């Protein structure tokens, strides 16, 4: 199992990036969460089989059709305490 904290920058707020992330992560069977940050980025935690987490990273580089992803910063972290994938309140 692999767990990554990802910070996505670019045109990623106001373009349905969080909703798309929830749907995509659930489709891959991942646990974790996604939220907007005050600095205009989106932050997400992905936990699951390595292949599924890597597939999610590839998907995040494209995002939904109206998004423009400029950068992904990826940090390995500890596994989340709760199952499932959710959208957290913005920070």
From Swiss-Prot:
This is Acylphosphatase. Belongs to the acylphosphatase family. The keyword RNA-binding does not apply. The gene is acyP. The keyword Hydrolase applies. It catalyses: an acyl phosphate + H2O = a carboxylate + phosphate + H(+). Residues 3-89 form the Acylphosphatase-like domain. It comes from Rhodospirillum rubrum (strain ATCC 11170 / ATH 1.1.1 / DSM 467 / LMG 4362 / NCIMB 8255 / S1). Gene3D superfamilies: 3.30.70.100.
């Amino acid at each position: 199992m692999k767990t990554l904290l990802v910070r996505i920058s670019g045109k990623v707020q106001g373009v349905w990036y969080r909703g798309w992330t929830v749907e995509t992560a659930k489709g891959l069977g991942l646990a974790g969460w996604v939220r907007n940050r005050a600095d205009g980025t989106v932050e997400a935690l992905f936990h699951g089989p390595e292949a599924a987490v890597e597939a999610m990273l590839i998907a995040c580089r494209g995002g939904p059709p109206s998004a423009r992803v400029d950068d992904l910063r990826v940090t390995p972290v500890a596994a989340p305490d709760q199952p499932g994938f959710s959208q957290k309140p913005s920070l």
